[in-house]
């Protein structure tokens, strides 16, 4: 109970910067006192979560983030604090809170954040011609890779999906969070171009890997459909997927087929 309680107190205390909490454990013969006070708030929380992960570095080998991105704003009685950064990894670690309560199933505040983040990233990439060469579309999954984020919301009368408060369902929150994140994060990207380009390079790399994986899946499916269609098992497919510019050689016997393969371009020719 004590360790679980301490962990909960420890994380929540990040959301209340400057306030000290004293935890006294009298269950043992020797009384144990633990004190928690974090002046850095959600910024310090993100650094705590990211402490053991491989940092995203610049060309000089230095940590890209001297400190995490921090957003603080208010609209229509909704107070928002958000901090985020990227590391070199592939997994996302995101903690949405409402009135100091963690929503493990997310909710409207998380949906608003994701929507704004995807919009800001794509807008910045397009405005700086970072996608033109690769002809890619960045998705939310690409942005998630290596993202660590804490969202803390303070709102009157929040609505949850159940008594456990694991998911926020207040409908008005999504647009408010989306508007605030979009506005503040756009400014941050414009003011920090060197860091922004390193972030985008990581995200674009994830998008390229996703695109390569998609094409590989399509190729496997296409070849599988050819086999299922009853075509001869000895048909050697060409390497490109488009019909234009390709040709089909039909020969009699394996020996002739071997000569045909040696004398043709496998990129455009099926034998």
Identify the residue ranges that each predicted region occupies:
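Single conserved hydrophobic/aromatic residue that forms the stacking wall/gate
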Residues: 1-10, 265-271
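N-terminal cationic and glycine-rich segments that engage phosphates or anionic surfaces
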Residues: 218-223
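Metal-dependent catalytic core segments for phosphate chemistry
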Residues: 171-176, 180-195, 244-270
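GHKL/Histidine-kinase-like ATPase module
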Residues: 11, 16-19, 23-166, 227-262
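Cofactor-binding active-site loop characterized by glycine-rich and histidine/acidic residues
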Residues: 215, 228, 267-270
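Long, highly charged low-complexity segments enriched in Glu/Asp and Lys/Arg with interspersed Ser/Thr
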Residues: 195-204, 209-213
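Extended, well-ordered alpha-helical scaffold/bundle regions in very large, multi-domain proteins
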Residues: 140-199
């Amino acid at each position: 109970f004590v360790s679980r309680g301490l962990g909960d107190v420890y994380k929540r205390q990040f959301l209340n910067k400057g306030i000290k909490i004293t935890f006294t454990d009298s269950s043992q013969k020797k009384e144990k006192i633990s004190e928690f006070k974090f002046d850095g708030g959600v910024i310090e929380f993100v650094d705590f979560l990211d402490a053991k992960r491989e940092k995203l570095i610049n060309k000089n080998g230095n940590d890209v983030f001297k400190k995490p991105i921090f957003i603080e704003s208010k609209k229509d009685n909704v107070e928002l604090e958000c901090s985020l950064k990227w590391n070199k990894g592939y997994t996302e670690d995101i903690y949405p809170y409402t009135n100091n309560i963690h929503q493990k199933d997310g909710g409207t505040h998380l949906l608003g954040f994701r929507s704004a983040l995807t919009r800001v990233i794509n807008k910045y990439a397009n405005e700086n011609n970072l996608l033109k060469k690769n002809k890619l579309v960045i998705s939310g999954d690409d942005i998630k890779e290596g993202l660590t984020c804490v969202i803390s919301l303070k709102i009157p009368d929040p609505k949850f999906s159940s008594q456990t408060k694991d998911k926020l369902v207040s409908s008005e929150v999504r647009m408010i969070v989306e508007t605030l994140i979009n506005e503040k994060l756009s400014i941050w990207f414009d003011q920090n171009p060197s860091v922004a380009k390193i972030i985008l390079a990581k995200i674009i790399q994830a998008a390229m890997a996703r695109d390569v994986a998609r094409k590989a899946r399509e190729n496997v499916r296409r070849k599988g459909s050819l086999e299922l269609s009853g075509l001869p098992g000895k048909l050697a497919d060409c390497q490109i997927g488009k019909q234009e510019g390709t040709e089909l050689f039909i020969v009699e016997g394996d020996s002739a087929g071997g000569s045909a393969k040696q004398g043709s371009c496998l990129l455009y020719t099926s034998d």
